């Protein structure tokens, strides 16, 4: 089990109250594999993250089984979970609840997140697209983001909390990274 897996597992266990669930799911949705009116798809190797996404989606929508789960294996036998919201009605309801319009799927809207839950939103983003190295080796936390505007919004949000973060490009994606222990802890 990797250190990132352990951190994500611990974060999943901390999402307990209604406001945290709402903020965490918003972070998970914005940074998941696919988030649009036509498709919502969350992909992970972490079984607890898969369960969390499914449970949060059901909780926010107020229904059961809104998420379809497909489990497959990579060549190295690691499980990969693909979770999708297949119902157009459910996708539309999530889009409505998070105040998203056609031209802002890949922007962070701070008015959607209660100030007390910004860190929970960041936890959701980390669960979707983040990784962290074990502190014994080095301090390095990163978010790999497919959309540059979304990456810039995330960078500004992190920096607004007084955390030193930087943005770079790697393999066609934007990468926000933190290297100092004070910023990561």
Where are these regions (language model features)?
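N-terminal, positively charged regions that mediate nucleic acid binding
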Residues: 1-39, 43-53, 57-58
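DNA-contacting interfaces and partner/effector-binding or oligomerization modules
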Residues: 44, 51, 56-77, 82-185
